[in-house]
Design a protein with these regions (language model features):
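Extracellular/periplasmic periplasmic-binding protein-like sensory domains
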Residues: 239-313, 321-322
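Periplasmic-binding protein-like
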Residues: 93, 97-106, 126-128, 169-174, ...
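Immediate post-signal peptide segment of exported/extracytoplasmic ligand-binding proteins
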Residues: 26-37, 65-73, 163-168
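Extracellular/periplasmic bilobal clamshell ligand-binding domains
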Residues: 222, 316-323
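Extracytoplasmic "Venus flytrap"
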Residues: 35-57, 77-84, 106-107, 173-181, ...
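Extracellular/periplasmic Venus flytrap/periplasmic-binding protein
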Residues: 88, 133-134, 141-245, 280-290
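Beta-alpha junction/loop-to-helix N-cap segments that form part of ligand/metal-binding clefts
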Residues: 47-52, 62, 66-138, 147, ...
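Gram-negative bacterial Sec-dependent N-terminal signal peptides
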Residues: 2-27
Length: 323
C-alpha cells in the first residue's frame, strides 16, 4: 500500500470513528497537544523511550510545527511498565490538558489500559510499541490504531520460516504478561499449522534477573527450537544466559521480537545466526537510510523500527488532520 492510499485510509478511518471532531478540537484550542506515554527508564527504554519522543518531535518539526494554524505541543511521560500509571496519566492529560492524540509506547499491559481510556474519552490512540494482538482483536476499538507490528505478524514472519527450515519442535520462554502470552499463542498456532509441535513452555516475570531455572526446563524438553516470547532487557538477558549455559549447543534460539538496540547490546558473537522478524530497518533502501542518518545526527544511534513507526504514525496523523 503506498503512502497516499495509507493517508486516505487513515482519513476515512478517523471520520468513520467520529474523529473528524479532532480538527474541531484542534481549532478550538490554542495548541494541539500530543501525549506520549512509554517506558523511559526500564527494560524497554532503549527500544523506544526518550528517542521515541525524539522521533515524534522530528515528525512535528518536519510537518512545520503547526496543524490547522495551531502550534503542536508534545507531552511525554514514563509509565514505568505499570498499567495503572499509564491509564492515570492518559486520563489526566485528556481532562486537564485537552489532549488531542494519545500515543502509547512499549508494554502491552499499559497499551491496553490506555486504549480503554481513549475509547472512554473518544480520543485517537496510536500504539506503535506494544505488540499484543488483543489491541486489534478481542479488545479492539474504533479509536485505536495499532501501528508497525503485532504478535500475529511476528508469529507468521518468524514461526513459519523456522518450521520450514526444519525447526519442528518448539519450547517457549515467555514473558508473563499480555504481550508474552499473545506472542506465544500466536506463534504456537503458526508452528502447528505448518506441521510443527510445541512440547512445552515456561513463563518468567517481567524484567527477570535470573533465567537459569527457566532455561534448564527448556533444555530438558529436548525441543529443537527455543522460542523467546519476550523483548527488550528480558530478551537480552535470556540470550546471554542461554549462551552462558550452553543451551545453543542443543537448541536453536529464535528471537520473536528483536530490535537493533538488542543486537548492539548483545554483540555479534551472541546474536550470530539468530532468526528474527522486523517491521522496518534503517538500511532497507535510500529513504530509510536518509531517515536513519537524520535520526542518528540527533540521537547518536540508528532508530529502532518502533522509533521509525513513531515518526511515521505522527506524520500520517497530522496529514490526516490537516486534510
Amino acid at each position: 500500500m503506498n503512502m497516499n492510499r495509507k493517508l486516505k485510509t487513515l482519513v476515512a478511518m478517523l471520520g468513520a470513528a467520529g474523529l473528524g471532531l479532532v480538527a474541531t478540537q484542534a481549532q478550538a484550542q490554542d495548541k494541539v497537544k500530543i501525549g506520549f506515554i512509554t517506558d523511559m527508564s526500564s527494560l524497554y527504554a532503549d527500544v523506544e523511550g526518550k528517542n521515541g519522543a525524539l522521533a515524534i518531535q522530528m515528525a512535528i518539526d518536519d510537518f512545520g510545527g503547526k496543524v490547522l494554524g495551531k502550534p503542536i505541543e508534545l507531552l511525554s511521560a514514563d509509565h514505568q511498565n505499570k498499567a495503572d500509571i499509564a491509564a492515570s496519566k492518559a486520563r489526566e492529560w485528556i481532562d486537564t490538558q485537552g489532549l488531542t492524540l494519545l500515543f502509547g509506547g512499549t508494554q502491552s499491559g499499559t497499551a491496553l489500559a490506555m486504549a480503554e481510556i481513549a475509547k472512554e474519552k473518544k480520543r485517537v490512540f496510536f500504539d506503535s510499541g506494544a505488540g499484543s494482538s488483543a489491541l486489534t482483536n478481542d479488545q479492539c476499538s474504533p479509536y485505536t490504531v495499532h501501528y508497525a507490528y503485532d504478535t500475529v505478524a511476528l508469529a507468521k514472519g518468524t514461526g513459519s520460516a523456522v518450521v520450514k527450515q526444519g525447526g519442528k519442535s518448539w519450547f517457549f520462554l515467555t514473558a508473563d504478561y499480555a504481550f508474552g502470552a499473545a506472542l506465544e499463542a500466536d506463534t504456537a498456532r503458526v508452528v502447528k499449522e505448518n506441521g510443527g509441535t510445541v512440547v512445552g513452555s515456561v513463563k518468567h516475570p517481567l524484567n527477570a534477573s535470573d533465567f537459569s531455572s527457566f532455561l534448564l526446563q527448556a533444555q530438558n524438553s529436548k525441543a529443537q527450537v527455543l522460542g523467546l516470547a519476550n523483548a527488550g532487557g528480558d530478551l537480552i538477558n535470556s540470550i546471554k544466559a542461554a549462551k552462558e549455559f550452553g543451551i545453543t549447543k542443543s537448541m536453536k534460539l529464535v528471537g520473536l521480537l528483536v530490535f537493533i538496540t538488542d543486537v548492539h547490546s548483545l554483540g555479534l558473537k551472541n546474536t550470530e545466526g539468530l532468526l528474527l522478524t522486523t517491521s522496518w530497518d534503517w538500511n532497507l533502501n535510500d529513504q530509510t537510510r536518509a531517515f536513519g542518518k537524520k535520526f542518528f545526527e540527533k540521537a547518536k544511534r540508528m532508530p529502532t523500527d518502533i522509533q521509525a513507526a513513531d515518526y511515521s504514525a505522527t506524520m500520517n496523523y497530522l496529514k490526516a488532520v490537516q486534510a
